[in-house]
Amino acid sequence: MRLILYSKPGCHLCEGLQEKLQQIQTLKIDLEVRDITTSEDWFQQYQYEIPVLSLVETSGTSEEASEVRLPRLSPRCTVAQLEKMLQKY
């Protein structure tokens, strides 16, 4: 499962979500963290919404990948709750 976490330096909610993702043992997660301050497009799109978690989907034999934005969970969610949500995908 390939995930993208849109974040920025000093974002404690982002850091908390990243730590929880790293604690998940039952799913193989390839996590890419993108700093929104390095891209004007990302910054404009996500500046008020981070942390944003997206699933990268590839279509069959095609090399093209698309991002599917995942539902935002409460910062108080547990690792188990996050894991349960991700298992749906």
Q: Which residues does each PLM region occupy?
A:
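Local sequence-structure signature of Cys/Sec-based thiol-disulfide redox active-site neighborhoods
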Residues: 1-23
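Thiol-based oxidoreductase modules, predominantly thioredoxin-like and allied folds used
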Residues: 28-40
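Structural micro-motif
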Residues: 47-55
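Alpha-helix C-terminal capping segments
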Residues: 21-26, 86
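Non-catalytic, surface beta->alpha helical segment in thiol-disulfide oxidoreductase systems
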Residues: 57-89
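N-terminal beta-loop-helix "entrance" segment that forms/cooperates
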Residues: 40-47
